[in-house]
Structure formats: C-alpha cells, structure tokens
C-alpha cells in the first residue's frame, strides 16, 4: 500500500484502486493525462539516445519504502511506501555539450493553462538551471487542440512571478511558445526547437 504525504493510504494492486477516493480527483486525472505525453517524450528520448544525438532521461519519482514482505526467498513485495513530492522537474540530460532540464505538462483546458500545474519549487529550480548556464524549458500540451508547445523557462517563470492571474491564456503560448514537430520516431521532437533557439548557426 502507498501512503501519500498527507498520511492517507491508497491500495495500488490495480489501477481502479489507485484512483480511489483516498487520492484527490484532480491529481488522479492529471496523472493519467500526463502518461501519454510522457510516453511520447520517452520514445523521442530513446531515439535521441539510440542515434547518439543526446542523453536525456526522465527523473525517477522519489519513493520511501516503509514495509517489504518476502513471500518467497527469491521475491520481495513492497506492501507500504510513501510517494515524495518531486523536488525538481521531469527530465534532464546533455545535448551538444549543454545541460538540458525541462518539465512536461498535459492540459485539458482549451483556453488557458493553470499556473497551479507548476509548483513553486519547480519554478525555483528552472531559474537555478538558467543562472548556471543550462537550457531550461517547459513543454505544454493542449490535449483537446492536439498542440504541444515548447516554452523557454524564463518566459514561464517571469509570467509566474509577475502576472496577476491564476492561468496562462492559450494565446500567450501562441506568442511566446513554439509548436513542437512530431514524427513516428520522434513524437515530441523538442530538440529541433532547442537547435533553433539556442544553437543558431
């Protein structure tokens, strides 16, 4: 069984039980929606790695194991654990000698992107990456529009800290972001945008 930071427990033997009332509805739906974007980014990253283009991986979600059962000598079963809040962002790695760090978010709302989808510690982390010369950005997918935007981190963090509103309008992404191209082998080919913005010939 998995315990969340608030001390509540959720049984994880099946997807149906995971999405129980012990877990806030918004968090469950957001996690489910994010899996498709995450899957596509992972496929893209595998292509980059296989073709020696870049080394970029998803960061593991921190978990504290509380109890382990050993039903067999050769098997161990985790029966209780805590999900920790992620401390930074989703992905990081190296591309063309530069450190790459980014967050990826799915969004089901057509007209805007809720700022609560990005946590304050993630904003601080993105700012820190920029201060130390890394390339940081946010990938936001408007699911219903089937559009995926690349947004440089500074534009997101500036909006987060200065705008007097709780969401970022869709039109803002059209002006401040770049649509990410897609192909069969690279469903979210974000390095094409990195090349265009950060490695101008």
Question: Residue locations for each model-derived region?
Answer:
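Conserved catalytic cores of phosphodiester-cleaving nucleases, focusing on short active-site segments
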Residues: 89-110
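Nucleic-acid nuclease catalytic cores
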Residues: 127-157
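Short, electropositive alpha-helical surface patch
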Residues: 151-173
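Acidic-basic catalytic patches of nuclease active cores, encompassing PD-(D/E)XK
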Residues: 21-78
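Charged phosphate-binding loop/patch that engages nucleotide di/tri-phosphates or the phosphate backbone
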Residues: 2-24, 28, 174-201
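Short, solvent-exposed loop/turn segments at secondary-structure junctions
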Residues: 65-66, 109-112, 146
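Mg2+/Mn2+-dependent nuclease catalytic core
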Residues: 105-132
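Positively charged, polar, low-complexity stretches
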Residues: 53, 68, 82-93, 162, ...
């Amino acid at each position: 069984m998995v315990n969340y930071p608030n001390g509540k427990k959720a049984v994880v033997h099946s997807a149906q039980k995971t999405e129980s009332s012990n877990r806030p509805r918004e968090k469950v739906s957001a996690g489910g929606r994010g899996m498709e974007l995450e899957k596509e980014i992972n496929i893209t990253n595998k292509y980059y790695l296989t073709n020696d283009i870049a080394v970029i991986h998803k960061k593991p979600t921190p978990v504290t194991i509380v109890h382990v059962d050993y039903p067999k000598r050769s098997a161990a079963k985790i029966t209780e654990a805590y999900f920790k809040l992620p401390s930074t962002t989703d992905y990081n790695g190296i591309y063309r000698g530069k450190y790459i760090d980014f967050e990826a978010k799915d969004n089901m709302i057509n007209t805007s992107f809720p700022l609560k989808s990005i946590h304050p510690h993630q904003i601080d982390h993105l700012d820190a990456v920029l201060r130390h010369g890394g390339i940081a950005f946010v990938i936001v997918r408007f699911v219903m529009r089937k559009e995926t935007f690349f947004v440089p981190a500074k534009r997101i963090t500036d909006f987060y800290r200065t705008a007097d509103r709780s969401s970022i309008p869709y039109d803002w992404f059209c002006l401040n972001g770049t649509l990410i191209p897609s192909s069969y082998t690279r469903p979210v080919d974000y390095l094409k945008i990195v090349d265009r913005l950060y490695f101008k010939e």
